[in-house]
Amino acid sequence: MSITKDQMLEAFAAMSVMEVVELIEAMEEKFGVSAAAAVVSGGGDAVAAEEQTEFDVVLTSFGENKVAVIKALRSATGLGLKEAKTMAESSPIAVKEAVSKEEAATLKADLEAAGASVEVK
C-alpha cells in the first residue's frame, strides 16, 4: 500500500509546527541536505548592468512658446486641442510611458524644438 501525495499533504497539515520542524530535521539528516536558502553573492552587479528598455517621456515645462508645444503634443500623442492644452499646463506630466529608446529620443527632440523642457526617465 503506497501513500499518495495528497495523503502526505493532509498528514503535514495535521502536524503542529514543532512536529514539522522535527520532520524537516529528520529529512535533512536522512538525505544529507539542508533546507536553508542558498546565498548567491555578486548578483547585484548583473541587475545594475542590465540596460533599460522602456522609457517615460516627461514634460517638465512648456517654456515660452506654449502654442508650439501644444501642437507638438497633439502630433505626438493624438490628443485633441483641449487635452493637449491641459497636459501642457499640468507639467510636470508624463507625455508617453514605456516607450522605446528611439521613440523617447524622437519625442524629446520634437518637444524641445517646440520650446518645451523634457526629461526622459
UniProtKB/Swiss-Prot annotation:
| Biological processes, Gene Ontology terms | translation
Q: Which InterPro entries match?
A: Ribosomal_bL12, Ribosomal_bL12_C, Ribosomal_bL12_C/ClpS-like, Ribosomal_bL12_oligo, Ribosomal_bL12_oligo_N_sf
Alphabetically ordered keywords of this record: Ribonucleoprotein, Ribosomal protein
Record's Gene Ontology CC terms?
cytosolic large ribosomal subunit
Superkingdom is Bacteria
GO MF, one example: structural constituent of ribosome
* HAMAP family in UniProt: Ribosomal_bL12
The record describes its quaternary structure and partners as:
Homodimer. Part of the ribosomal stalk of the 50S ribosomal subunit. Forms a multimeric L10(L12)X complex, where L10 forms an elongated spine to which 2 to 4 L12 dimers bind in a sequential fashion. Binds GTP-bound translation factors.
Family according to the record: Belongs to the bacterial ribosomal protein bL12 family.
Q: Which purpose does this protein serve, as stated in its record?
A: Forms part of the ribosomal stalk which helps the ribosome interact with GTP-bound translation factors. Is thus essential for accurate translation.
> What's the protein name?
Large ribosomal subunit protein bL12
| Organism expressing this protein natively | Shewanella frigidimarina (strain NCIMB 400)
Q: What is the lineage of its organism?
A: Bacteria, Pseudomonadati, Pseudomonadota, Gammaproteobacteria, Alteromonadales
Q: Gene that codes for this?
A: rplL
